Amino acid sequence: MAGLLSTFDTFSSRRSESINKSGGGAVIPGQKSTVSVFVLGPSVTDDADKLFIATTFLAHSLNTDKQHSQRGGFLVSLLAMAYSSPELYLTTNGVNADVKYVIYNIEKDPKRTKTDRFIVKTRDMEYERTTEWLFGPMVNKSPLFQGQRDAADPDTLLQTYGYPACLGA
């Protein structure tokens, strides 16, 4: 685990130069100056759900599409999820007056059939388009899952990509 954290530290310090220009983080489409940090809400307790969300975020972080230019933010969100501490992200990267920080909760909603029963929300609002973008069909087509997202297991992912590849290093 120590090696994993040091890789994150290195990756984070490499990104610190561009934080003032782009806002860093997982910049979702249409919110260029917003740092979006995703954390797990209290309704996500099952280990299988946590693994699913982690692999989904890895798929986004490995995606080289233009919309995913801030893919490092997904990895930082993963770290924030692991420690239940979004403040970790905000203090690591400093503060920028021009950038708005938004902390999104990922919650489990049993009434939903799409998006694997997850919803992205803040205290005030549910974000349907962001939920669709994060958990929608694009992710299942990722080479990480090869169309079999539900069957992905951590050992296979690590053997295929290794920690450095999964961390974007």
UniProtKB/Swiss-Prot annotation:
Compartment(s) where it occurs, according to its Swiss-Prot or TrEMBL record: Virion; Host cytoplasm
Primary subcellular site in the record, as a coarse category: virion
GO molecular function: protein domain specific binding; RNA binding
A single GO cellular-component term on record: host cell cytoplasm
Gene Ontology biological process terms from the UniProt entry: negative stranded viral RNA replication
Annotated keywords: Host cytoplasm, Ribonucleoprotein, RNA-binding, Viral nucleoprotein, Virion
Note: Most abundant protein in the virion. Since the viral RNA genome consists of 15,383 bases,there are 2564 molecules per encapsidated genome.
Complex and partners: Homomultimer; forms the nucleocapsid. Binds to the viral genomic RNA. N0 interacts with the phosphoprotein (via N-terminus); this interaction allows P to chaperon N0 to avoid N polymerization before encapsidation. Interacts as N-RNA template with the phosphoprotein (via C-terminus); this interaction positions the polymerase on the template.
Family: Belongs to the paramyxoviruses nucleocapsid family.
Domain notes: Ncore is globular and carries regions required for self-assembly and RNA-binding. Ntail is an intrinsically disordered monomeric domain in the C-terminus.
Known role: Forms the helical nucleocapsid (NC) in a ratio of 1 N per 6 ribonucleotides, protecting the genome from nucleases. The encapsidated genomic RNA serves as template for transcription and replication; encapsidation by N is coupled to RNA synthesis. Forms the encapsidation complex with the phosphoprotein protein P. Before encapsidation, the newly synthesized free N protein, so-called N0, is chaperoned by P.
Name of the molecule in the record: Nucleoprotein
Native source organism of the sequence: Sendai virus (strain Harris) (SeV)
